[in-house]
Amino acid sequence: MRLILLGAPGAGKGTQATFICQKYGIPQISTGDMLRAAVKAGTPLGIEAKKVMDAGGLVSDDLIINLVKERIAQSDCAAGFLFDGFPRTIPQADAMKAAGVKLDYVLEIDVPFDAIIERMSGRRSHAASGRTYHVKFNPPKVAGVDDVTGEPLIQRDDDKEETVKKRLEVYSAQTRPLVDYYSNWAKAEPAAAPKYRAISGTGGVDEITARAFAALAG
């Protein structure tokens, strides 16, 4: 099972990636983890990437694709892999296609933006313990305070509505076009292209997992 998981920030990709990887016995690969591992291992590509990053530059798509090819050739990818957050742009998808990286599925977890904003901007946390709440879905017993200590809850900067909206704007501009890219490729070249599947990411976690497994079985 070789697949790409697509979806906006806050769509629940991380949760579903864990379940999919457990079911199929495959590793979850993110470019950040992959870069860090290559740098730590001191591979030729890792050394090259470190030079770029140390100079404050962005690692090129060509280098990322070479790292991807190196990573998926490792033994833990024998049964497949799940790409999380990659490719992020059309040029990366094109480069992956040109490099002959074979994929079975592209699975999109689709959640309306207003639901994502509600999901993320409603989160509150207790800084000292890491306990998390949600003003609507999992509220504390007393609004704004931690159930255990009675200390005030905070809203992380990442969860503030304006931050969430900015991240969704970046996703719309850069990554959302991949949905059309892969769905159009699947229609044009069904034999060569990965199967494109979209599921709703709203509802309970178990419900969404069942949808994901059903989509990957067909």
UniProtKB/Swiss-Prot annotation:
Look up the record and name the pathway of this protein: Purine metabolism; AMP biosynthesis via salvage pathway; AMP from ADP: step 1/1
- Mainly localized where? cytoplasm
| GO molecular function, a single term | adenylate kinase activity
Q: Which CDD domains match?
A: ADK
InterPro entries per record? Adenyl_kin_sub, Adenylat/UMP-CMP_kin, Adenylat_kinase_CS, Adenylate_kinase_lid-dom, P-loop_NTPase
Q: What class of enzyme is it?
A: transferase
Q: Where is this region: LID?
A: 122-159
Q: Which PROSITE patterns match?
A: ADENYLATE_KINASE
Tell me where it resides: Cytoplasm
* Residues involved in AMP binding: 31, 36, 57-59, 85-88, 92, 156, 167
Q: Where is this region: NMP?
A: 30-59
Carries keyword RNA-binding? no
Q: Which GO CC annotations does the UniProt entry carry?
A: cytoplasm
Keyword list, A-Z: ATP-binding, Cytoplasm, Kinase, Nucleotide biosynthesis, Nucleotide-binding, Transferase
Q: Which EC number(s) are documented for this chain? A: 2.7.4.3
Tree of life domain: Bacteria
A biological process from GO:
AMP salvage
Where ATP is bound, by residue?
A: 10-15, 123, 132-133, 203
Catalysed reactions, semicolon-separated: AMP + ATP = 2 ADP
* Alphabetical list of HAMAP family matching this protein: Adenylate_kinase_Adk
Subunit comment for this entry? Monomer.
The entry assigns this protein to a family as follows:
Belongs to the adenylate kinase family.
Q: What is known of its domains?
A: Consists of three domains, a large central CORE domain and two small peripheral domains, NMPbind and LID, which undergo movements during catalysis. The LID domain closes over the site of phosphoryl transfer upon ATP binding. Assembling and dissambling the active center during each catalytic cycle provides an effective means to prevent ATP hydrolysis.
What is the purpose of this protein?
Catalyzes the reversible transfer of the terminal phosphate group between ATP and AMP. Plays an important role in cellular energy homeostasis and in adenine nucleotide metabolism.
Write the protein's name: Adenylate kinase
Organism of this sequence:
Albidiferax ferrireducens (strain ATCC BAA-621 / DSM 15236 / T118)
**What gene does the UniProt entry assign to this protein?**
adk
